[in-house]
Amino acid sequence: MSSMFKQISKSLFYEKATMSVLFFLSCLGSFMYFFVQVSIDGNLKHLAYNKTNGLLINSSQKELLIALHSNQILAATFLIIFSVIAAFAFYMFFLKYYRNHMKEIGCYKAFGRSNKQIIAVMFFINSSLSFIAFIVGFILGWICSDVLLQLYRSSFDIESLHKGILPSNLAIGFLFIVVLSGIMAIVPYYKFLKFDISSLLRNFPEEHQNKWIVFISNKLSNAVPTKYRRSFRIALRKPLAVSLLFLSVGCFTVLSIMSMSLHFSSQYIYETQTLGRSYKYDIQFENYQPYHPLEEDSTFYLRSNVKISWKGNEINQQAIGFHKKTNLFQFYTLDHKKLFLPKEKEVYINEALSELYGIRQNDYIEVNIKHKIYKLKVAAIVGNAENKTIYLSEPQLASMLSIKESSYNGILSNTVPKQYENKSIITEKERLAYLQKNNVSNKISAVINQLLGCIIGCLLLYLVILLNFQDCTRNILILNMLGYSANSINKMLISIYKPLLNVAFIIMVSLSVIVCQFIQKSLSIKTGDYIPFQTNLFIIGGIWLLLNLIYHLIHCRFNNNIAKIQNAGQTKKYIL
């Protein structure tokens, strides 16, 4: 048993590059999960302890509690996505590994080793590798969680924050990172259980090509240019390899588009939240104030919390009504056209309501104010609306609130009258600082996601293309011994993957955009923070260039490996 363990370990770690990629994927999944979860569990435990002992929780702690619950969803999302990607990579590698080492498997079985023993060894080796990655990721996540704690301190003005991890969450991470990876290492082996020892030793299991695969590959290859026809037919007769290529391109494209969208959305939010505003002070009152004349550089407004009902959704919003048209706050549509104040029985909504819930212009929505429901027409979608805010006419909002017309509880102004100096005042500087802080925070998150997206996408793509190339190693060496030139072999077996890669990109890019829109929409609804989807042709073009660059780098590396095999005189080892 020990000799088989040593031999399998040696053959596995001979693939240094691939095993390093698998280790890094497991480590990354563990790191991202614990990076978020460690900053959650300690604080949730602390807040729960305060509640149990009857201690009061202030407003900042309540906001922190909401953020922690939202981040729990984020941590679970990280764990699931990274675990699925890692499991996919492990499955691909070990499927190729078993195919390329059938003779060794046949030898183990010929010497009396059972399938259960082989599976146990494979599971143990792979789980051990994943366990080391799990521990490394946990330690790094614990250390780096200080970054999130610092963000909590700056966002919620709370100094007493704690790290921690619940045993249940530690066990969940272990199951997804370690156990799942071990299982995915042995799942491909079950395909080889049906082969007898003689078939394995001959290295040519008696598999019959599915007639439908042959038929489809022949039909599809006839549709491509003549110079690619033979190569295309050869590639399509390996449907799993082609499927994995398409899937990896899809994952790479989704991760890349998502990361770039997150980066640009933070700037988009900052720009829309500063557009059309030329006031310096926002003076707010707890109670409604009676009308009295204001300075020319001031205007008052009325605000109230409301609920919008739309297709079964109850959406909390803030309603604002301005007393008169003013240059202090100019409404703009999504295409940057100026808007006047809404009319009676009309409402202006923000972009988030339109994008997340599908409310369109001229639709009718139900607005619940003080337990009374009003049906209003959506007259426009305001591109520069305040977050979670809708706009009505001031007389209409006053009527809904059953207060006198021209009453107000807020003033926008460029000066602060002396009688209001002790009121709640949000200055332009404070407002811009808050937006900038959120912008920087969002950009940091976007850069992290961008780097992770590119790293994971590149690694996954690298793994798939390299494994497909390695699958051709034996055929390349045989053709070389038969006298075919390197250029001819390249055109026949390797170059076809470049057009396949580009076809996969063209097919998957539209689907990737839809997936990214769905993910960002779901995150926006779950967290309550609107994340507008942002992409353009330059981003798509950049992803395509990066995709082809990765292909050429892998191609060069593979050609160098083939040359090393030939120069070292190891051709027979790969053929026999």
Predicted regions and their residues:
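N-terminal Sec/SRP start-transfer signal
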Residues: 1-30, 97, 123, 127, ...
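C-terminal membrane-exit region of the final transmembrane helix in multipass inner-membrane proteins
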Residues: 33, 37, 93, 171-207, ...
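Short helix-loop junctions at transmembrane helix boundaries
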Residues: 42-43, 70-74, 138-172, 503-569
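Hydrophobic alpha-helical segments
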Residues: 65, 69-70, 102-209
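Interfacial "coupling" helices/loops that link adjacent transmembrane helices in transporter permeases
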Residues: 88-128, 460-499, 569-570
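Small-residue transmembrane helix packing/gating motifs
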Residues: 381-415
